[in-house]
Amino acid sequence: RGLGDVYKRQISYCAVCDGAFFKSKTVAAVGGGSSALQSARLLAELCKKVYVIHRRNEFRGEQRLCEELKSFHNIEFLLNSEIKKINGKTRLESVLVKNNLSGEETVLPLDGLFVAIGKEPQNEIFAEVTELDENGYIKANESCKTSTDGIYAAGDCRTKAFRQLTTAA
């Protein structure tokens, strides 16, 4: 087994799918949008410790989620921070996190890493023909019908609870 194969089991893009594998462990959720915040929320109920790492000084995700996460004793926010290195010989052992303001670097021991970045919809071109929600997703019901007759939206470009390959198909 190569190092990449080992990391594949410890680096996830889906907290719903893989969160239970990290019960009572220390993990990090990376990102600043609603997907990252939802991941952190779910992980906080399962894991001993959850770091939320975001490169900016504030989250772009739903404000309601931000406030809710502050009530969890096992969540620690690392704002203005980025992961610079993933460490481990045969498994994920830690990450090197750099604070972009102070330049300070910290090694965080981790059992799992959940990546939730780069999930911003690119739907602006549809704004003139159908309705978008406050986050830029196309408003559509479970039948994929939009507010405009004859226009349907399928996949992760539309408003929905989960964004995964299996639910986008």
Language model regions located:
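Short, small-residue-biased leader/transition segments that mark boundaries at the very start
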Residues: 2-7
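FAD-site-proximal beta/loop scaffold in flavoenzymes
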Residues: 8-21, 117-167
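Active-site acidic short loop of glycosyltransferases
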Residues: 24, 110-111, 148
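Beta1/beta-strand and adjacent pyrophosphate-binding region of the FAD-binding site
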Residues: 26-29
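Glycine-rich Rossmann-fold phosphate-binding loop(s) that bind the pyrophosphate
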Residues: 31-33
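N-terminal Rossmann-fold NAD(P) dinucleotide-binding loop
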Residues: 36
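Generic hydrophobic/aromatic pocket-lining and core-packing "Φ" positions
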Residues: 40-41
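A Rossmann-like FAD-binding core segment of flavoenzymes
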Residues: 45-141
